[in-house]
Amino acid sequence: MDLDDALLDDVDALIAADTRQLLPMTASAGASIRAAGSLVTAEAIDRVVDDGRPHAVVVVGGGGSRAAGDILAAVAGSGSPVPVMTFGGPSLPGWVGPTDLVVAVSGSGRTPETLEVAAEAARRGCRLLVVSPDRTPLAHLADQTRGAVSVGVGIPTVSGTWRARTLMWSLATPLVLMAGGLGLVEHAQEAVDAAADELDRVADVCSPLRDSVVND
């Protein structure tokens, strides 16, 4: 696809070309992190921590939701005391069992594959953490599963719309904070705060209001 460089210096044309409003939603990533972090209660963290450190953390999600698990794996790093793995479904690996923590992540709370895996985890007696909007099928499944912990997430919107690909940071933040409680990530809250500040900085530097000559 050919790109007209002149478009980069025409703010009105650039904004008009962004019909999906991805630019403002991406620019609000820092705010999304802070909003998501404010929804992670100490009670929820304590409920996860009280069951002890799992043998493995298995994050299940599709698309941008799965990317949240990849972020957790990267933040935990190779030095994590337990392995952190991400799967897209449609089923759990055979070795996953009651000593493992399954984290079901869905920006819509309705992803069929994620719902199937979460239900399978419940049947196996796995520890279950659900990260999804409230009042969705996935959140309801957590409510009906003994011992499961559900963390609600707000969906960042611009003019009443939202895009799945912009939810990554909102979904990853609860995972990092929970991992901090389990001792898998050091200084988790500080890391989350620093990430939000850095994303704010990048959004400012890369703003369409800046001349393309100085826009990074």
Question: Could you describe each region identified by the protein language model?
Answer:
Residues 52-200:
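Glycine-rich phosphate-binding loops that contact phosphosugars or nucleotide phosphates
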Residues 34-51, 205-216:
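A short, well-structured juxtamembrane/interface segment
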